[in-house]
Amino acid sequence: MSKVKLTKENIVSLLTQSEDVEFEEDQNQVAFNFKTFCQENLDLIKKMSITSCLTFLKNRQSIMKVVKQSDFTFGKVTIKKNSERVEAKDMTFRRLDSMIRVKLIEETANNENLAIIKAKIASHPLVQAYGLPLDDAKSVRLAIMLGGSIPLIASVDSLEMISVVLAIYQDSQVQELGIEPTKYNTKEALGKVCTVLKSKGFTMDDAQDNKGKEYAKILSSCNPNAKGSIAMDYYSDNLEKFYEMFGVKKEAKIAGVA
């Protein structure tokens, strides 16, 4: 019996006919590996500057809406608006986004580039929302990860522990971070990260455990509630005038809110 391609028509045959049906193995057994995909496609974005990469992350949602309006082509690659089946070699917005984050993380190995990224990414909405302190390369790498597909990035060598620790942090701080469970299931994301690590045979030995603790220490110092305070400080002089008009001192009001 010859094997057939996994198509809509052949699925119908599988469900409605008495003949034996088997699909080609390259379609139902080959799992997607983002690490391999990234290695094969990073050249597509090699011309992107650090600033351009950061611009992409800062405007991710707006860019995604434009890209998904129709088939989007850049260079020789097309992100299809509609696709019944996403193949292992197909480019998707999520894969593109993850590649850009990996590229930026690699750039942090250079001190000059690290300084540029640190200065620019501090103003990104998610970094401010998390109240993430940017003190060193590890904290900057965490900042780059925020908002990205952690399960995809977890497959890249040396990014396993930063991925699993960030996934755990998000799962443990759902309410504090204002994460909407119906839009992003943190428990499911953590499960996917662990599945990726297990499939690549990753071992959490003492060295990896210590590495994870360093990332956990940084995340434990985050203050998700700091965003509002930072914004209030920005308008400090103006706010004080209005507080006084209501007969309330600004400092007392802020202390009450905190």
Curated annotation (Swiss-Prot):
Free-text note on domains in this protein's UniProt record: The N-terminus and C-terminus are involved in homooligomerization and play an essential role in viral RNA synthesis.
A Pfam family this chain is assigned to: Tospo_nucleocap
Gene: N
Disulfide bonding pattern of the chain: none
Protein origin, superkingdom: Viruses
Primary localization: virion
Subcellular location: Virion
Its job: Encapsidates the genome protecting it from nucleases. The encapsidated genomic RNA is termed the nucleocapsid (NC) and serves as template for transcription and replication. The NC have a helical organization.
Keyword Ribonucleoprotein: yes
Recorded GO CC terms: helical viral capsid; ribonucleoprotein complex; viral nucleocapsid
UniProt name for this protein: Nucleoprotein
Subunit structure: Homotrimer. Binds the viral genomic RNA.
Native source species: Tomato spotted wilt virus (strain SA-05)
